[in-house]
UniProtKB/Swiss-Prot annotation:
GO terms for molecular function: ATP binding; proton-transporting ATP synthase activity, rotational mechanism. Keywords: ATP synthesis, Cell membrane, CF(1), Hydrogen ion transport, Ion transport, Membrane, Transport. It is found in: Cell membrane. Belongs to the ATPase epsilon chain family. The gene is atpC. Produces ATP from ADP in the presence of a proton gradient across the membrane. It comes from Lactobacillus gasseri (strain ATCC 33323 / DSM 20243 / BCRC 14619 / CIP 102991 / JCM 1131 / KCTC 3163 / NCIMB 11718 / NCTC 13722 / AM63). This is ATP synthase epsilon chain. The keyword Cell membrane applies.
Amino acid sequence: MADPEKILKVSVVTPDGIVYSHNATMVAMRAIDGERTIMYDHLPIVTPLAIGEVRVKRTHEMNDRVDHIAVNGGYIEFSNNEATIIADSAERARNIDVERAQSAKKRAEQHMQEAKEKHNEREMLEAEIALRRAVNRLHVRENYGK
């Protein structure tokens, strides 16, 4: 059993509402400057997140299960052993619709090709971001969605 004094409260919130909220012993994510892991009593931090996977190691009562969440930007704020991730969008691995993610990937690839042909850098950047989001969702679902 996890020491109740060493538990974090982890929440992931999007403009659509709460996507995830559980007690945990660790949360790891990709910040814009690299991988970050937060455990009990970590110093307070606010940092922007990159498109990537968030891993939450649940408490021993949950057999140390690790939950995986696809996060598309945002930031994490941690203080007083509460981690709140405010994300542009986020989905738990088990909730990701593979067909939708594959369609988004295909659309992004088409937009990239069109932007390349038009030599439009802004559209190319937007398409690259959309592609990274779709690939992230597919990766999280295919590797961790049960």
